[in-house]
Every structure is written in structure tokens, then in C-alpha cells.
Swiss-Prot record:
The N-terminus is disordered and is involved in binding N(0). The region of interaction with the L polymerase is necessary for transcription. The hinge region is highly variable. The central domain is involved in oligomerization. The C-terminus is basic and essential for binding the N-RNA template. This is Phosphoprotein. It comes from Vesicular stomatitis Indiana virus (strain 85CLB South America). The modification Phosphotyrosine is found at Y14. Residues 109-170 are annotated as: Oligomerization.
Length: 265
């Protein structure tokens, strides 16, 4: 530190400091920039071949685009390859695919009806490969078929497969005609005298209340259904009794549970 301090003090008192700095700058400006390799040559170092990094720089100035060879023009077909077993000469479009029979195996089981001391049990096996949504739809379909049995006799329905699924239709049964001896003074009820319950659509039926203070419930098929077609579409049929048709209408209008609590159905 003492020597460095002395040098600084000496330079402060040196009268020609500015002139010396200017001469040094002038010498540096006139000096040609040379690489370390060229400086070594000036010092008499034995000359050798330029290093690879200098040659790469020199070659970059004279570099030209390489010639692109046409591989297709140089291609010579191998005669032996054409004689290999299984080689088919000609365009691929001429190759005729062979028809192959594909067989899909499945472990699906047909519905099984079992009987034991507890009663009958029907087992339905899910089809394979169903997604979660498809499984839910399949179960909803089975449930809807079972619930529809409340409104019609499934055993009497016709089954028809279509492109969109299955169509089940109610089979219209022709009543048998029996020869009977009429009984005098026998008056059939109004519901028995008609062949189609819808003929009583304007006839009201009355249900008595379970508790005192309530008015009887009087209702007709016309009040529950807008037309016979609507009555049939929800499971009604002409062979129903008048009361069965009325109860069907209450269920259809979602009034049945409320009515059976208050009235004797």
C-alpha cells in the first residue's frame, strides 16, 4: 500500500503526465490489430499450420453450396429384390384384400327365471362393453317396462323390433260370444253395458270422504283426459272398468296419493 501511495503522489507532481498519456493513445491508435497467432510469428516462433479455428474462418468466405445429388436418378433397382418370395410387382391399388370372417365372442347370458320358497326371480345380465351412461339408460328402460305393467297386460302385448329399438303394442282381444239364457229382471250396470269404457267419459264417479267435513270427490274421465287418444297413450284401454279408468287418470294427473288419503278409493 505504501508503494502504491507513493506512485500516486509522484504522478500528481509529474508535469509531463498529460503529454505521456496522449503519446500512449496515439501509439495504440496507429497499431494494427493482430491475432495472437500473428504476434507469435513476429516474435520468431516457428511457423506451423494454422489452427483449425483459423481455417474455418477462412473457408467460410469461400464456402459454396454443395451439389445436391439426385438420389432417384442414381437408384438402380435390385433385381434380386424382385425375385423375393411374396414380392408383388405393380401399384398397391391392384392388391385385392382377402375377406376374413370375424367372430366376436360374448359371455352374455339370456334372462333366467328362477323359483324358490321365496317366490320367482328374474335375472337379467347387462350387455358387455356399456359405458356408465349406457348402463344407466339400459336400467331405466327395464324399469320403465316393469312399471308399465300397472297399466296394461304385458303378456298380451305384441313385440316388434325396429331400427330404433323395440315397439310394444297392446293386442286388441275380441271377446268371446257365449249363448246364454237371459235372466228376467236383471239390469246390468252402466259400466257393463258398454264395450268401451270411454263411452262413459262424461259420466262422473263419486268417492266418499274418509273424514267428516269433506265434500265427496266427483270426477269424470273428461276432466282427467283431453281425449281418448291421451287416455290410451298412458296405458288405458277400453276393457277397463269405469273405476279403473278414473284411478288411472288420478295417477296420470298425480292426484292419486292425495285423493286416497282423503277419500275411499
Amino acid at each position: 500500500m505504501d508503494n502504491l501511495t507513493k506512485v500516486r503522489e509522484y504522478l500528481k507532481s509529474y508535469s509531463r503526465l498529460d503529454q505521456a498519456v496522449g503519446e500512449i493513445d496515439e501509439i495504440e491508435a496507429q497499431r494494427d490489430e493482430k491475432s495472437n497467432y500473428e504476434l507469435f510469428q513476429e516474435d520468431g516462433v516457428e511457423e506451423h499450420a494454422k489452427p483449425s479455428y483459423f481455417q474455418a474462418a477462412d473457408d467460410s468466405d469461400t464456402e459454396s453450396e454443395p451439389e445436391v445429388e439426385d438420389n432417384q436418378s442414381l437408384y438402380v433397382p435390385d433385381q434380386e429384390a424382385e425375385q423375393v418370395e411374396g414380392f408383388i410387382q405393380g401399384p398397391l391399388d391392384d392388391y385385392a384384400d382377402e375377406e376374413v370372417d370375424v367372430v366376436f365372442t360374448s359371455d352374455w347370458k339370456q334372462p333366467e327365471l328362477e323359483s324358490d320358497e321365496h317366490g320367482k326371480t328374474l335375472r337379467l345380465t347387462l350387455p358387455e362393453g356399456l359405458s356408465g351412461e349406457q348402463k344407466s339408460q339400459w336400467l331405466s328402460t327395464i324399469k320403465a317396462v316393469v312399471q308399465s305393467a300397472k297399466y296394461w297386460n304385458l303378456a298380451e302385448c305384441t313385440f316388434e323390433a325396429s331400427g330404433e329399438g323395440v315397439i310394444m303394442k297392446e293386442r286388441q282381444m275380441t271377446p268371446d260370444v257365449y249363448k246364454v239364457t237371459p235372466v228376467m229382471n236383471t239390469h246390468p250396470s252402466q259400466s257393463e253395458a258398454v264395450s268401451d269404457v270411454w263411452a262413459l267419459s262424461k259420466t262422473s264417479m263419486t268417492f266418499q270422504p274418509k273424514k267428516a267435513g269433506l265434500q265427496p270427490l266427483t270426477i269424470s274421465l273428461d276432466e282427467l283426459f283431453s281425449s281418448r287418444g291421451e287416455f290410451i297413450s298412458v296405458g288405458g284401454n277400453g276393457r277397463m272398468s269405469h273405476k279403473e279408468a278414473i284411478l288411472l287418470g288420478l295417477r296420470y294427473k298425480k292426484l292419486y296419493n292425495q285423493a286416497r288419503v282423503k277419500y275411499s278409493l
